[in-house]
Design a protein with these regions (language model features):
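N-terminal pre-transmembrane cytosolic regions of membrane proteins
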Residues: 1-60, 110, 119-127
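Cytosol-facing regions at membranes
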Residues: 1-4, 10, 20, 24, ...
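Short, structured protein-protein interaction patches enriched in aromatics and acidic/basic residues
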Residues: 60-77
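Generic beta-strand structural signal
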Residues: 6, 25, 70, 99-100
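Extended alpha-helical interaction modules
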Residues: 72-187, 204, 211
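Membrane-associated alpha-helical segments
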Residues: 102, 152, 173-175, 180-308
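Alpha-helical transmembrane anchor segments
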Residues: 289, 294-348
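Alpha-helical transmembrane segments
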Residues: 34, 149, 156, 237, ...
């Protein structure tokens, strides 16, 4: 826990034991930055600052959506900023603020072990660095809060900028026909869309929170102006994310259309191949029918000739005068009859 006294000349580090005296003195802005809430930090929030138990509970536990609680002497705000993790996962980095008349308490929400401990401290450290360098001289806790929240929105904007490069890369793959691994492409597509939706949600909810804060009766016109500026920053991030989501949606539609066209062409080629095979099979069947028909036509004469050609001693028909011409007549008639039948059935 860092206890700081921000004055017109800079910033001074103080001890926790000095907090009650600092809050009573009326000199400068008392800034307490709590990287993670432990028993001592919870005691400070409850006993020294005497914050509402519900606000303390929200500061100790993880908030999945931004929150705003307005009290008579302070405002509690919970916000999120994105951090890209493994395999496209987006971590929600939480920052809670108690903004009073003479103090600002910043509490960094429960941190996922997969996130480096320095990541949640970026915005508060950036503001502290600016104060130490003389580039920032906040006169009120709201002005200090404005600087910290502005750093958050810049981080969100940088997050969108990085995802924009991914969107352009996906678009180049699709339009260039360079999708060599569809599974990897779809994974990258989902991760990019997920990241844009996550940061868009954070910015939209942040805009709603700060827009509501502008209507609070307990803040001055200057404070209202700074709050409205933070709302405008969140709204700008949301609009940028919306634009990239629309662009990515166009890439998805183009890719889907490409897949449909390719699938249609493949199906058409398969149908053409099947048709060619069917035509070849039909032609072969016609040939088989013609061959079978002629074989049947010649089978009858062959059968009769074979019988008459048998070289047996006792064959009465060989001694019959009309046997030979009758055999020839039967051969001719049977052949003609078979020819007519096959012709009528279009086998010939």
């Amino acid at each position: 826990m860092d206890v700081l006294l921000v004055t017109a000349t800079g910033v001074e580090s103080k001890s926790v034991d000095e907090l009650p005296a600092l809050l009573k003195s009326g000199d400068g802005i008392v800034w307490v930055d709590i990287p993670s809430v432990d028993d001592e930090a919870e005691r400070i929030l409850s006993d020294v600052f005497k914050f509402h138990p519900l606000a303390v509970k929200d500061a100790v536990e993880r908030n999945r959506v931004p929150k705003l609680h307005a009290y008579s002497d302070h405002v509690f705000v919970a916000l999120h900023t994105p951090e890209l993790g493994q395999r496209g996962h987006v971590h929600y980095i939480e920052l809670d603020q108690f903004i009073g008349r003479r103090y600002l308490v910043t509490v960094h929400g429960p941190i996922n072990p997969a996130v480096h401990p320095d990541v949640p401290l970026r915005q508060t450290r950036e503001a502290l660095t600016r104060i130490e360098a003389g580039r920032l001289r906040p006169a009120t806790p709201f002005e200090l809060s404005h600087a910290i929240v502005s750093a958050m929105t810049r981080g969100q904007d940088d997050f969108v900028e990085n995802l924009t490069r991914d969107v352009w890369h996906l678009e180049q793959q699709v339009t260039g026909g360079d999708v060599s691994d569809p599974e990897e492409f779809l994974t990258e597509l989902f991760q990019t869309r997920h990241g844009l939706l996550a940061v868009r949600t954070m910015a939209a909810l942040g805009d709603a929170i700060y827009d509501s804060m502008t209507h609070l009766s307990g803040i001055t016109s200057d404070e209202r102006r700074m709050v409205a500026d933070n709302a405008r920053q969140f709204d700008l991030v949301r609009n940028t994310a919306d634009g990239e989501l629309s662009y990515l949606h166009g890439v998805i539609e183009f890719y889907q259309t490409t897949l449909i066209v390719k699938s249609t062409l493949v199906g058409q080629r398969q149908n053409d191949e099947i048709q060619r095979m069917s035509e070849a099979s039909y032609s072969q069947n016609e040939d088989v029918k013609r061959i079978s028909a002629w074989a049947a036509i010649f089978f009858a004469p062959t059968l009769i000739g074979t019988i008459y050609g048998m070289n047996f001693e006792h064959m009465p028909e060989l001694g019959w005068t009309l046997g030979y011409p009758l055999a020839l007549l039967v051969m001719v008639l049977s052949s003609i009859a078979l020819y007519v039948v096959f012709k009528r059935n279009k086998w010939l």
